[in-house]
Amino acid sequence: MLSFTSVFSFFLHALLLKTAFSYVIKRNNPVFDYTSEKVRGVNIGGWLVLENWITPQLFTQFSSMSNPPTDEWGFCEVLGADEAASQLAAHYSSFYTESDFATIASWGVNVLRIPIGYWAFNVVDGEPYVQGQEYWLDQALTWAEQYGLKVWIDLHGVPGSQNGFENSGKTGSIGWQQNDTVTRTLDIITYVANKYTQSQYASVVIGIETVNEPLGYGLDMDQLKQYDLDAYNIVNPLSSSVATIIHDAYVDLSIWDYGVVSPSSYNLVMDVHRYQLYESDECSKTLDDHLSDVCSIGDSIASSPYITVTGEWSGTLADCTIFEEGVDSSTFIGPNSGDISTWTDEYKGAVRLFIETQLDQFERGAGWIYWTAKTGGPSPTWDMGLLIEYGVFPQPFTDRQYSSYCG
């Protein structure tokens, strides 16, 4: 049976379907106005949520094991609570510091997306996670405010796992939407929203993301849309300057057109992630194929009725870094580009053109957030700082060495 809310949202959206930014309700004196400012951001990946390919130095200690852990759940389970807590404390205090935030601000970045797992706020019996991440999130907000950066708080992993990937905290099957996992997640959203919409964070926190990369084809989309509406109804009444960020779940944006969350909703932003490397056929494409795909992505973003930010993307043209494989286990297609100092001018130019084209197309929407600010392994096309150092990522972001590929 349809609820009154879903019926009302359907008819409201039907009236506004052909609109884009012009009908989005303007915020009163917003800290960040997504309808007039472009998000030019970077993710703080691999810090408060472990990803083995970003910080391989934390996972190579398990290399002699027949079934080594690949995620934070396994990391904590194998090491035990005390040793895991000790190693993670050292990681949190060193992988990102205040000087990193100062450097990031100097690049011209205006928004940070900071991933954090549900276990930072809620751990139950049977879950091996250790905590301590919330302290460092608070520290990051202090640094961000000091250097004029705005922040999205991104709930990167939820109970049960929303996608079965290591970035959710636990690799394997998708267990979210089973038992009490959604209720637990909404309780965490309530805690995060109540805390980070308080006045001391008003000048820095501009978004709370309900869940990172829920895998649409492995979930009940109606339940996901209802969850996003419930989360929106938690966050939105608390602040006029903190947007609710929802992820597109890797389904066509048109599938959201008749969801329970209307694109005209006050303070609502759609997050899309666009990579071209996680399947073998994508890795083997020519540069022209990749660029043409970017043009098509730009068309989709520009036609979306949602305020749309490309919240993850990279300059990576090949699936080629330690611990990082595609969804279909595609790997090592294309040049082994792990040492940027060995790149030819031709390859640098190809990556630069790919990045420039994505910047142009993603700004047809509300902007972009690169994945990621830095890595601890041989992954230069994922490392914004390294790309900037070698002149592959534009500085300033509007600088262009190539004419527009998409016309």
Curated annotation (Swiss-Prot):
Superkingdom of source: Eukaryota
Disulphide bond pairs: 295-406
Residues of the signal peptide: 1-22
Role of this protein: Beta-glucanases participate in the metabolism of beta-glucan, the main structural component of the cell wall. It could also function biosynthetically as a transglycosylase.
Keyword DNA-binding: no
GO cellular component, one term: extracellular region
Gene symbol of the encoding locus: exg1
Protein name as annotated: Glucan 1,3-beta-glucosidase 1
GO biological process, one term: fungal-type cell wall disassembly involved in conjugation with cellular fusion
Root EC class: hydrolase
Active site, per annotation: 213, 312
A single GO molecular function term of this UniProt record: glucan endo-1,6-beta-glucosidase activity
Family: Belongs to the glycosyl hydrolase 5 (cellulase A) family.
Catalytic activity entry: Successive hydrolysis of beta-D-glucose units from the non-reducing ends of (1->3)-beta-D-glucans, releasing alpha-glucose
InterPro entries hit by this protein: Glyco_hydro_5, Glyco_hydro_5_CS, Glycoside_hydrolase_SF, Glycosyl_hydrolase_5
Record's keyword annotation contains Secreted: yes
